[in-house]
Amino acid sequence: MALLTEIDQSRALLVNDLALVRWSLAKTYLRDLQRRGAAIVPSLWHDKMSPDIIQSAFAAHGTDRVIIKPVVSTNATNTYLLTRERAVALESELAETFRDRPFVVQPFIANILTDGEYSLFYFNRTLSHATRKVPKPGDFRVQEEHGAELTSIEPDPALVETGASVVSLIDPTPMYARADFVRGPDGRFLVMELELIEPSMYLRMDGQAPGRFAEAFDHYVKEHRGVSA
């Protein structure tokens, strides 16, 4: 962050805005989105681990499977899918992993296994393209690094509407943004994560996406530098 602050205070233009970078570093931005009206995957937030937290989360979420992950992490690092039994078996490991480390506990959304995770990509709040990632058999993680299958999609109109609503809640306007969603048990699309810090944009999945990105970047620079079009 010190380097980013130095860049922001220099003549260089930091993209996205430093305020957005700071805000999105920790997954607690999901709480802010929820307060602003976004539907997120239900989340319980904790600053440190204690023996009863995980077991109580099963009851709180009304589920037999939960996901626990650090508030600051990437690529599903230190992310666990837990049943009650596995939570007991891994009690010592979980205590060590999340000792004095903020984390979030969410219900496992089973649709992720078959329906996958939907990602919408925006340049200056305008939707560019969309993808779907489905975990490999026997896994729950949707990252390519873990073997997930990535495809380009034409997003469902309801997903497009939900995505536009979520992105409108981000302030200031990001030059680029990726919004990840999962379909909840009731069919609604729920926000899993926002990616505002150099995310994988999968420009290769849409032949027009690189051009859209370049045009959006040009517009962003001119707007923030006061350059006439």
Tell me what each language-model feature is.
Residues 15, 67, 178, 191-193:
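Generic enzyme active-site microenvironment
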Residues 77-172, 190:
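Phosphate-binding site of ATP-dependent enzymes
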